[in-house]
């Protein structure tokens, strides 16, 4: 049987030999769509020099019905918010007959660009739950495995070309919460959240700021903590440090998530201040643990298990549609007004 050459593939596709050679080497100088077409044709023709990485990539896109292994990468996050997302991922993978490989990435591994050994095996897709450094993401992308991200860096453009991105709507929901505080007569409204960490927290701040500006209120930077914090304000001492820098106590504090809100409420209680009588507090995430804390927290319901399922659904779609443009998908949320923001202030005050 005649050996299939690069020239044979080029002739079949009416492409130049140089273009085909680059495509078979998975070169970024050739468009994604062209690489896929060339690799697929070469495989069908029996071209024997496809690299293992490229061959693996081809198999992912053409043996959709085989049992797939999906790798989930995440930091060992402090918040319980992530547990139910992983449960949703697991349930949806089971529904699709897929195997789950869950990998916790340590701070040291991320810093040293150490990837899980799982990625060296036959993996069909990756779900990334944490916002890793650009350098670490670049290492992952070298495996040419389809990726779906939950959330993104504050500068979302850093990863839009790498894979599909699922983002919980944050801007409008936080604007709605802040507007409600304003309508209740509050004007001195603070914010706590590390906007350098991820897009959703950045969007939450923009929603908060937008509500103030539309109401003719200038945001007071003295009661706004958006700086980089080592654990993104997931530790009480970081929240306490931020609050201790406030020159005065705001009428309300809008928090980027429920964990921050909990630490704020505990801090206020330690200072003899009451929520919402003295200070209104709001969160985001609607974590189950907050249902045991009084006063009940005004927050945003994400639907974590549903979100986990949605990540898998997007990855399954991507495996079947590899050459479609990458997508950024916003998932709807629900604002829940509760007792923690129910105070009203006379505008005359």
Protein language model features and the residues they cover:
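An alpha-beta-alpha
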Residues: 175-217, 327-342
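Alpha-helical recognition/docking segments in bacterial nutrient-uptake
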Residues: 1, 58, 62-179, 242-248, ...
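Short beta-strand elements in bilobed, periplasmic/extracellular small-molecule ligand-binding domains
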Residues: 93-105, 209-235
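Short acidic capping loops at alpha-helix termini that bridge into adjacent secondary structure
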Residues: 188, 219-223, 275-280
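Flexible loop/turn connectors
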Residues: 240-349
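N-terminal helix-turn-helix DNA-binding module of bacterial transcription factors
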Residues: 1-59
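Short, solvent-exposed amphipathic alpha-helices that sit
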Residues: 80-95, 173-176, 199-219, 263, ...
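Hydrophobic alpha-helical segments within soluble ligand-binding/sensing domains
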Residues: 164-191, 210, 233-241, 261, ...
């Amino acid at each position: 049987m005649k050996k299939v050459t690069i020239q044979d593939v080029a002739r079949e596709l009416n492409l130049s030999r140089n273009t085909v050679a680059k495509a078979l080497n998975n070169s970024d100088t050739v468009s994604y769509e062209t690489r896929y077409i060339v690799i697929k044709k070469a495989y069908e023709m029996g071209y024997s020099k496809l690299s293992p990485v490229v061959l693996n990539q081809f198999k992912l896109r053409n043996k959709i019905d085989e049992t797939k292994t999906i790798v989930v990468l995440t930091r060992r996050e402090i918040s319980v918010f992530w547990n139910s997302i992983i449960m949703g991922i697991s349930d949806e993978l089971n529904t699709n007959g897929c195997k789950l490989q869950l990998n916790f990435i340590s701070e040291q591994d991320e810093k040293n660009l150490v990837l899980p050994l799982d990625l060296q095996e036959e993996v069909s897709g990756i779900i990334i739950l944490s916002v890793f450094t650009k350098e670490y993401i670049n290492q992952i992308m070298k495996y040419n495995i389809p990726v779906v991200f939950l959330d993104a860096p504050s500068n979302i453009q850093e990863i839009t070309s790498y894979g599909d991105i699922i983002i919980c709507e944050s801007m409008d929901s936080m604007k709605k919460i802040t507007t409600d505080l304003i309508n209740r007569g509050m004007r001195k409204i603070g914010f706590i959240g590390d906007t350098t960490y991820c897009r959703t927290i950045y969007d939450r701040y923009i929603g908060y700021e937008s509500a103030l500006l539309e109401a003719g209120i200038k945001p007071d930077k003295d009661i706004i903590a958006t700086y980089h914090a080592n654990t993104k304000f997931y530790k009480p001492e970081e929240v306490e440090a931020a609050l201790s820098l406030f020159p005065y106590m705001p009428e309300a504090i809008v928090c980027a998530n429920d964990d921050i809100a909990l630490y704020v409420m505990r801090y206020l209680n330690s200072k003899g201040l009451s929520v919402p009588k003295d200070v209104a507090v709001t969160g985001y995430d609607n974590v189950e643990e907050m249902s045991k804390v009084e006063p009940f927290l005004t927050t945003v319901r994400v639907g974590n298990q549903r979100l986990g399922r949605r990540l898998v659904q997007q990855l399954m779609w991507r495996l079947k549609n590899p050459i479609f443009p990458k997508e950024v998908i916003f998932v709807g949320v629900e604002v829940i007004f509760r007792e923690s923001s129910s105070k009203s202030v006379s505008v005359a005050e």
